[in-house]
């Protein structure tokens, strides 16, 4: 959180954006049955990042939270389409039947998913 009286905050209020790169470390992508997200796809998310001056985004797709093995593939595909903009969190689900396999798959996709969410 930035101090609302700081030089940086004043610059933002006067110019509508900051002169430094913005890196978002918590985002979710794809549709969710119970929550409305206006920017669900990787294409929409990157377009929104461009509009708002966000350089890079670390995310976890909702599909990966419910179905880690298939959802992880979506996350990695999105990152590989936008390698300079997106990074994903690798999901190891608490109800996973084969955590060792999920960890191995996470290591195989570490270029796309450098973070872990348990």
Report the location of each language-model feature.
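Active-site gating/metal-coordination segments in enzymes
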Residues: 55-56, 66-118
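An N-terminally biased module of ancient metal coordination in phosphate/nucleic-acid-related enzymes
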Residues: 1-73, 104
């Amino acid at each position: 959180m930035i101090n609302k009286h700081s030089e940086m905050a004043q610059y933002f209020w006067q110019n509508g954006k900051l002169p430094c790169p913005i890196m978002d470390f918590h985002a979710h992508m794809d549709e969710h049955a119970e929550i409305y997200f206006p920017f669900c796809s990787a294409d929409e998310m990157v377009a929104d990042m461009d509009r708002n001056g966000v350089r890079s985004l670390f995310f976890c797709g909702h599909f990966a939270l419910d179905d880690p093995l298939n959802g992880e593939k979506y996350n990695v595909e999105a990152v590989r389409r936008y390698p300079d903009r997106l990074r994903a969190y690798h999901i190891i689900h608490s109800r996973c039947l084969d955590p060792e396999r999920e960890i191995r798959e996470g290591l195989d996709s570490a270029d796309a998913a450098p973070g872990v969410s348990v």
